Amino acid sequence: MSAAAYMDFVAAQCLVSISNRAAVPEHGVAPDAERLRLPEREVTKEHGDPGDTWKDYCTLVTIAKSLLDLNKYRPIQTPSVCSDSLESPDEDMGSDSDVTTESGSSPSHSPEERQDPGSAPSPLSLLHPGVAAKGKHASEKRHKCPYSGCGKVYGKSSHLKAHYRVHTGERPFPCTWPDCLKKFSRSDELTRHYRTHTGEKQFRCPLCEKRFMRSDHLTKHARRHTEFHPSMIKRSKKALANAL
């Protein structure tokens, strides 16, 4: 028997003893005539001294209260953890554990992806349900390059198609400028190349009068200005889009 169960047993015995001393059973009440015939000595021996009875009663009450107070601070026993619940969540990921991103590093799994289906939702998902939904959607929209030895992953199928042309050598976007025979695997590469023929420089520096064919060239130049801020280029791009 554990210590906590033993304390409960002793407290129960004390309370039962107190109730037995306080209550007088009905069948134990003898007629007045028979009580008068009992010798005074036997009555005194049966009931004892009232002072001793009161002392015993107070002692039992004190012990019972102490045991009940100790029982309040009994530590709660935690259930033992099953060894099956300690399995690594990576075992359920399958082939996703060796998938690499464009930077060459393994993709990190968010808490929502590592969470078991039967477990309770995390506080983050309760406070921000959109974050959990976004992470789940991103995990379902992975497009891995099928080329042997590559293993790059893209969020959009169009990006994967453009990347796959690097392996196949396909260039479906030819330049339409007269006497130009260049071809490109991506449409944005063709657009940038076409500006070399037209001389178009639509990206103007917000701090000076210089213009550039490519936005990355503009950003590289604008950072040389001491008063440059990235929001300046965003505003200039928005104004250009509205003008077109």
Curated annotation (Swiss-Prot):
SMART domains: ZnF_C2H2. A zinc finger (C2H2-type) spans 143-167, 173-197, 203-225. Induction: Expression is highly sensitive to glucocorticoids and shows diurnal expression patterns. A strong induction of expression seen during keratinocyte differentiation in a cortisol dependent manner. The modification Phosphoserine is found at residue 122. GO terms for biological process: cellular response to cortisol stimulus; circadian rhythm; negative regulation of keratinocyte proliferation; regulation of transcription by RNA polymerase II. Keywords: Biological rhythms, DNA-binding, Metal-binding, Nucleus, Phosphoprotein, Repeat, Transcription, Transcription regulation, Zinc, Zinc-finger. InterPro entries: Znf_C2H2_sf, Znf_C2H2_type. Epidermis (at protein level). One of its GO terms (molecular function) is RNA polymerase II cis-regulatory region sequence-specific DNA binding. Pfam families: zf-C2H2. It is found in: Nucleus. Transcription factor that binds to GC box promoter elements. Selectively activates mRNA synthesis from genes containing tandem repeats of GC boxes but represses genes with a single GC box. Acts as an epidermal circadian transcription factor regulating keratinocyte proliferation. Belongs to the Sp1 C2H2-type zinc-finger protein family. Interacts with ZZEF1. This is Krueppel-like factor 9. It comes from Homo sapiens (Human). The lineage of its organism: Eukaryota, Metazoa, Chordata, Craniata, Vertebrata.
